[in-house]
Regions:
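Sec-exported extracytoplasmic/periplasmic mature domains
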Residues: 55, 77-85, 230-242, 280, ...
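Short, low-complexity, Pro/Ser/Thr/Gly-rich segments in the mature regions of secreted, periplasmic
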Residues: 316-372
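Stable alpha-helical elements in mature extracytoplasmic
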Residues: 28-32, 68, 72, 76, ...
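Short acidic, glycine/serine/threonine-rich helix-capping segments at coil-helix boundaries
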Residues: 265-273, 280-298, 302-326
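C-terminal/domain-edge helix-coil "capping" segments
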Residues: 1-44, 154-267, 347, 351-372
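Acidic helix-start/capping segments at beta-turn-to-alpha-helix junctions
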Residues: 51-56, 88-104, 248-254, 292-296, ...
Length: 372
């Protein structure tokens, strides 16, 4: 009884508490929600619905080993619902609605603005791989009793690739929105390490074997892929600089081009008014007058001197080249965190380069011999 209680206490200490299932892009979705509150503060809510997102590779079939999930629709819903109040997911359950209506239920139905379609389109197993094996054996004691020692080490690493394609459909027209799609690939690592050792006397042998295997979960990789794809889709639809929600993100040319075309289609007065709206997001006390008045000129001088000094002192808010940085670089709470992480990564890379250079100099140094 005492041993059972002791064992129970030991395992209770080792028991892990539930943890949030978050990855880099899950946090990015939450940041996108904050960004939408800043960029789209006066815009209506975006209602989104999705078709069933299935596996088109058929590798989710039990006959193929069911290596990947066959339906990732719920992952897409979770990712969309994580963004925040500016993006609302509209479920599609017609059977449930009909049944409730027959029971006397009264409710309204919200029509979505956009429909998301797509599928898991690629699963390349063993896309690339590498392995190494080392063997050694020693025999001694011949004539006086044979003894054999053996050792074997094997390491194998294999990469697989998963791809997800998502597209956006305008619900009112039932037409795909041009260039509003995401097609992303994630690589999954499967690594195996095996060690064998044996010892034999007179032909009788005993030995041991240790084997370790590390395989990134394909379901977890697909969730990361879904979060990334939803982030890209919503960022494109809303023309929001979503790439700023992840470290070292690069501007999306589709969003940049769409914003440029929309800006250049405006009259000069409306362009100035839009710039005044953006200056307010930099905490500048300006009014939207669509005129380059004194408060606006002062705010422009302060903001551009602090954030974009490379553009000089002569700023023309009606030119896209001068408006673009103002629009895409509104300060966000996580900017400083990203800067610190980038600086730390740069310092670590520089330190590793210096250590490698020092090792190279040490190995290249000539060896001197002194005569005694």
């Amino acid at each position: 009884m005492r041993d059972a209680q002791k064992q129970l206490a030991t395992y209770q200490e080792l028991r892990e508490l539930p943890q949030a299932n978050l990855n880099l892009y899950s946090q990015a979705l939450q940041r996108l929600g904050y960004m939408l509150n800043v960029y789209k503060s006066g815009d209506p809510v975006l209602y989104v619905q999705s078709r069933t997102i299935l596996d088109s590779t058929n590798l989710s079939s039990p006959l193929a080993g069911a290596e990947i999930p066959g339906d990732v629709t719920e992952m897409v819903r979770t990712a969309l619902n994580r963004i925040g109040a500016k993006v609302v997911y509209v479920p599609y359950h017609p059977d449930y609605l009909v049944a409730q209506a027959q029971l006397g239920g009264q409710f309204g139905v919200t029509m979505p603005d956009y429909l998301i379609t797509g599928a898991l389109t690629e699963f390349d197993r063993a896309l690339s791989g590498a392995g190494r094996a080392n063997n050694a054996s020693v025999e001694f004691g011949k004539g006086h009793g044979s003894t054999t020692l053996g050792y074997n080490a094997t390491n194998v690493a294999i990469y697989s690739a998963l791809a997800l394609d998502l597209n956006v459909v305008n619900f009112q027209t039932q037409q795909m929105v041009p260039r509003m799609q995401s097609s992303n690939v994630v690589k999954v690592l499967d690594m195996t390490s095996e060690r064998n050792a044996s010892l034999g006397f007179y032909g009788d042998a005993f030995g041991f074997k240790t084997e370790g295997k590390y395989m990134q979960g394909r379901h977890s990789a697909i969730r990361t892929l879904v979060d990334l794809s939803v982030l890209e889709i919503v960022g494109k639809v809303t023309n929001t600089p979503y790439w700023r929600t992840i470290p070292n993100g690069h501007p999306d040319p589709v969003v940049v081009e769409n914003m440029r075309n929309a800006f250049e289609a405006l009259s000069p007065q409306v362009r100035i008014g839009l710039a005044q709206v953006m200056l307010q997001k930099y905490q500048q006390p300006v009014q939207v007058t669509q005129q380059l008045d004194a408060p606006t000129a002062q705010a422009v001088a302060q903001v551009y001197a602090a954030h974009f000094p490379q553009l000089g002192a002569q700023i023309d808010l009606t030119r896209w080249e001068h408006f673009e940085p103002l629009f895409f670089n509104v300060p966000m709470p996580w900017d400083e965190e990203f800067k610190r992480e980038a600086a730390q990564a740069q310092e670590a890379a520089q330190r590793q380069a210096e250590e490698a250079a020092q090792r190279a100099r040490t190995q290249a140094a000539p060896v001197r011999y002194e005569e005694g």
